[in-house]
Amino acid sequence: MIRFESVSVTYDGAAEPTVRGIDFEVPEGELVLLAGPSGVGKSTVLGAVSGLVPHFTGGTLAGRVTVAGRDTRTHKPRELADVVGTVGQDPLSHFVTDTVEDELAYGMESLGLPPDVMRRRVEETLDLLGLAPLRDRPLATLSGGQQQRVAIGSVLTPHPRVLVLDEPTSALDPAAAEEVLAVVQRLVHDLGTTVLMAEHRLERVVQYADRIALLPAPGAPLVVGAPDEVMAVSPVCPPVVELGRLAGWTPLPLTVRDARRRAEPLRERLAEHAGDGRPGAGAGDAGDGRPGAGAGDAGSGDSGLGVGERAGTGPAVAGATPAPPAKTPPHTSAGWTRRLFGRASRRAATEAPAESAPVAEVTGLGVRRGRVEALRRVDLALSPGETVALMGRNGAGKSTLLGSLVGLVRPTSGTVRVGGVVPYRTPPQELVRRVGLVPQEPRDLLYAETVAAECAAADRDAEAAPGTCRALVGELLPGVADGTHPRDLSEGQRLALALAVVLAARPPLVLLDEPTRGLDYAAKARLITHLRALARDGRTIVLATHDVELAAELADRVVLLAEGEVIADGPTADVVVSSPSFAPQVTKILAPQPWLTVAQVREALR
């Protein structure tokens, strides 16, 4: 169905091809996962299938790509539209109508399908993707995850023979992601649809793939094979695979179910390490009650997930200024969670000195948007040096809460104070030194034509020393040239640049909306390392995320939202271990022991 024959793509002005010598075939009715680190050319390969490369992007395509026998060099994207449906990383760029129902129907209208067929398929898609309650909603009022589901639905309704999906679950909550992937799998198995998908969150998708096509590095040869074979040599892998490597399991498990079947001996070994109060105690332990504290600083050599230095603990961080006093591990035996992780976050709130005032306080916050009550009676206090993950379903109110903290959203009721001021009443030039937001769409912050110009503008706006932003870019995004245009960066690279722009002003409160969207595991590990350093300096970090692995690695505290209300607020381990939707893979595999990360397990087994 899809055939690549010695394909190389070189963009205008580039010295080297973005991808080189791609040669493989995707048969009809097969789901192939395209994997690899950020920036290796996955989106370029996908674009070559739809004809966007080179007809829209420019550049030179050498070799040949055929889809259902049509050569994409001689067929423009509109001539492939009846065969190929494409969902890119940015759902907004796909929308051409104003409401959900109209968007689902638009592709079928363009193909001239009869009205009765269109009506039936729209209803089917609304039900399949859980969009029925949103059918009349304006697209601009939807959350990022809801927009992503609409974008996927809009390419499903014309029933294309080939689906090209670029990060299709990046903005979806875990439950919604499973629903969408189940629909895609059903199309493959029942209708023979051919799917080529790129996705960084391999823990969500690897079990659905018939084969994996791995781009291990820029310009490197493509590696194609069965999922377990490719994962054995891949530089990027999900936690279940990394845990399998650590435990020496062969073949490597790809699902939580497979891993649990083999995990009993590992659980028994780990149970021996629980008596001292927390997982990961021992080498590198700082003695302050943090799991595996110090392991990340020692450089354990983790290739993907980073080190669980602070996972599941309270807001106290060694060296933070100001910060709650150091914690001592609990010595009770009242259950695994308390023994292993303690109740540090709750204690820290009462033990903090009086002068350590909250960085931000939200009291009785309510936000109404038309008929939708986005937030209801939300109370939240954020302490210096604390890392908080806001989690919940798409549309739960996470982005609205972040918008309230940064002054983009005016409360309908209640109060919001950040650094002693009311955000929506504070001039932007003053507020930028108190709070910074990296939005879901990083392009909203990027206006210059080069990385260097973007960094120079950020330094001027923040009144920071020249080179401040560029140094941050070097840490978060190594290897990117000053003359690179932000639009030529991958989604993950643009996010890293936007984060550097925000951090140039050194705000004490840093807000990030879906910060790992588009990031591979190595880039996520670099982000975690940098955010930990900010927390050690006393900055408060608030993440709105669907990435349960990020929350397990980084967050001291998790706040769960549902229908605009806070339904849970506590230490990471206490909240996520008991949640079937928001528990990380390691927790599910090793339950009832509440380990959160591979790094904690590795540290315990030393």
Predicted regions and their residues:
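Conserved ABC transporter NBD signature motif
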Residues: 58-70, 414-422, 431
